[in-house]
């Protein structure tokens, strides 16, 4: 078993504007039965309550990632809208925007048919990226992914439970694409199982190293069902992609007290404040 020591220059400061109003919004999102919700049998991403997890991450985006209502969001691995649905209640309908991509057609169709008609600045597209679990017949290798947006198109890129299903060589490509797509001051919000060889003895997952590389896996039958990555490799590749790492925060999968389950990387595109609000 392995775990990560805290590797961060300093904790990311909480957004001072994220006060009682945000608490009210997050509670409302969990209890509002009129919010879009996919049929139970069609939810193919993760476990747990769809609304509660979406609301939780909206809180993380704002408090930790410093997401603002006017910003342009890119959701890599948007699934069936678990992050998009709560964002409809936060992003400014005239200045903010959201684009999500995923290889699973069912999720994209549900989002495009359910969310976009009511929120036209929320857009979804399927990319036929090959993945042994989610899209085994995909035509595009993960090492050749290039998202169809111009440089600096976004202020906030999220990869929630994406790195946990990628081999190291594909993760490097995604980091490079995130850096390309972020405008100056933009943030990457990425969750991962980041490992450095230490252990708390309380981890909920036990990882084994994949051959001699920086990748790890927890499930023998399906290595990419829960993939880990060397923390040093993750930090180095994020920097090589052109981003400045602000923090790598350990998650409570390790058996420790934390606000989030997976480890959380926050990295920033150098160059000042983002230039959101144009889409």
Can you describe what each PLM-predicted range is?
Residues 72, 97, 153-155:
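Structural signature of beta-strand start/N-cap positions in the alpha/beta core
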């Amino acid at each position: 078993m392995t775990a990560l020591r805290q590797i961060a220059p300093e904790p990311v400061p909480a957004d001072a504007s994220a006060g009682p109003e945000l608490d009210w919004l997050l509670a409302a999102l969990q209890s509002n039965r009129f919010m879009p919700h996919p049929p139970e049998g069609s939810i193919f991403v993760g476990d747990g309550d769809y609304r509660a997890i979406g609301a939780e991450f909206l809180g993380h985006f704002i408090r930790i990632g410093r997401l603002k209502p006017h910003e342009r969001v890119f959701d890599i691995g948007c699934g069936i809208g678990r992050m998009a649905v709560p964002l409809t209640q936060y992003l400014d309908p005239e200045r903010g925007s959201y684009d999500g991509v995923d290889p699973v057609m069912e999720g994209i169709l549900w989002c495009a048919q359910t969310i976009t008609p009511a929120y036209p600045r929320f857009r979804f597209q399927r990319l036929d990226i090959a993945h042994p679990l989610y899209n085994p017949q995909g035509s595009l290798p993960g090492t050749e992914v290039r998202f169809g947006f111009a440089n600096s198109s976004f202020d906030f890129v999220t990869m929630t439970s994406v790195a946990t299903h990628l081999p190291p060589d594909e993760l490097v490509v995604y980091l490079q694409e995130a850096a390309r797509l972020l405008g100056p001051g933009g943030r990457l919000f990425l969750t991962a199982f980041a490992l450095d060889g230490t252990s708390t003895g309380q981890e909920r997952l036990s990882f084994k190293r994949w051959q001699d590389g920086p990748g790890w896996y927890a499930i023998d039958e399906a290595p990419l069902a829960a993939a880990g990555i060397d923390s040093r490799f993750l930090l180095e590749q994020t920097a090589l992609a052109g981003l400045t790492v602000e923090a790598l925060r350990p998650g409570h999968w390790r058996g420790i007290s934390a606000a989030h389950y997976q480890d959380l990387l926050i990295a920033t595109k150098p160059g000042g404040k983002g230039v959101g609000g144009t889409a």
